[in-house]
Design a protein with these regions (language model features):
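Individual transmembrane alpha-helix segments
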Residues: 158-190, 196, 372
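Short, amphipathic alpha-helical segments
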Residues: 72, 92-103, 149, 180
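N-terminal amphipathic, basic-rich helices that act as targeting or association modules
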Residues: 83-86
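Juxtamembrane linker/hinge segments adjacent to transmembrane helices in membrane proteins
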Residues: 14-36
């Protein structure tokens, strides 16, 4: 609630201040956005609202000695700074912004720091389920082990759903544990880069990224809560992660900040989050999933982000294949995928060969955003259901 109030209160003054200094969106593609002219001049860098509204309650109410809280705060500030620099360059130096290689290096560096911290910190531990049989009554008893360092992760929709990365390298003998942790660190780096970039691609319509991210944040808060509660973790037969209750505090602040920001970002937007918001939003979601050992659930929880990223990759590769043959090939009418739904008839040049020419017609921006939210709600519910359905 505090983050929601801060976001809504600070947001109105931030928007006025940005308008007074003419710090606004200047580049809009009106060919695919019928409201592009109206959006020109809308303040950007609104991610600052999200960052402040998330950080202030956590600094006031969170346990700042908790390793997971520190990782979340660090992720927010780190990616927020990268996004801020990118937005600043776009507005003042070059419309292309920060060079992609620099952004990727920044994201990869954060991923390595997160992975190595979870590997080396004595506070980042789990308590696994141990099953024993009472000899007198043949009763099956499930209890928790002592805190241990582990590369175990959860495989969704599988009955015996724990996988240790170290077991993948069992052929290495005594080196398998080290190999498992190295693989884990690389996995963390990839996940942080993938989800933060997916979030960045999803930030293309009013309310799109903020709404989807709030839904994902709620799902992760539920998963973090059951992982932090020893009784619930035992009942659901999942890993108990001591200290992860601080993630719940952080995520509730995060969701509140997003909802407050959405008050101003909903169609028609009064402010855009920019890379200052979209990069840390994706990073927060990624790091949370990693900490609670649910990184393999990311394709489910972040399905919308995944679809956006895959659509861009497919579009780029297919276009390059066509260029080699002197042809204009496209998989979708536009990419990221959300742009394909708002292309008007006749906007695609006649010499373009579209592989998936769908949908027919043009959807309103508000309808596209709402339907993407619905998809996110369905996938978030599916992720939560995996706690029981295996």
């Amino acid at each position: 609630m505090l983050s929601l109030l801060i976001s809504m209160w600070f947001g109105q003054y931030f928007i006025k201040w940005m308008k007074m200094r003419n710090i606004s969106e200047t580049q809009r593609d009106a060919s695919i956005d019928p409201y592009g002219v109206d959006k020109k001049g809308v303040p950007t860098m609104g991610g600052i609202i999200i960052l402040i509204a998330t950080l202030v309650p956590c600094l006031l109410l969170g346990r700042l000695r908790n390793i997971y809280m520190l990782l979340m705060l660090g992720t927010t500030v780190w990616l927020g700074l990268i996004g801020f620099v990118d937005d600043y360059i776009k507005m003042n130096i070059s419309k292309d912004g920060l060079r992609p290689i620099y952004k990727l290096v920044g994201q990869a560096s954060l991923g390595l720091i997160i992975g190595l911290t979870l590997w080396l910190s004595p506070d980042a531990v789990i308590r696994e389920n141990i099953t024993t049989i009472n000899k007198g009554t043949t009763e099956v008893v499930i209890h928790k082990s002592e805190p241990v360092k582990s590369t175990i992760t959860t495989i969704p929709f599988v009955k015996n759903n724990n996988l240790s990365y170290s077991n993948i390298f069992s052929f290495l003998g005594r080196y398998r544990t080290a190999a498992g942790w190295i693989f884990f660190v690389l996995m963390v780096t990839f996940v942080v880069m993938a989800v933060s970039n997916g979030s960045n691609l999803n930030d293309g319509m009013d309310g799109m990224c903020a709404g989807n991210s709030a839904i994902m944040g709620i799902a992760l808060a539920i998963l973090a809560y059951v992982s932090s509660h020893i009784a619930l973790a035992s009942y659901l037969n999942i890993m108990y992660i001591p200290g992860s209750e601080e993630l719940v505090i952080f995520l509730l602040a995060f969701v509140g900040a997003l909802v407050g920001f959405l008050w101003y970002n909903a169609y028609p937007a009064q402010v855009f989050m920019g890379d200052t918001g979209s990069l840390p939003v994706g990073g927060i979601i990624a790091v949370t999933a990693i900490i609670i050992h649910k990184e393999l659930l990311i394709p489910v929880i972040c399905f919308v982000f995944l679809a956006e990223s895959v659509s861009v990759i497919l579009q780029t590769r297919y276009a390059k294949m066509g260029n080699r043959r002197g042809l204009k090939w496209r998989v979708f009418k536009r990419a990221p995928i959300h742009d394909a739904f708002r292309v008007k008839p006749g906007q695609i040049p006649s010499d373009f060969k579209i592989l998936l020419n769908w949908p027919h017609g043009c959807w309103l921006e508000s309808k596209i955003t709402t339907r993407f939210w619905i998809v996110s709600i369905i996938m978030a519910a599916l992720a939560i259901v995996t706690l029981k359905i295996r």
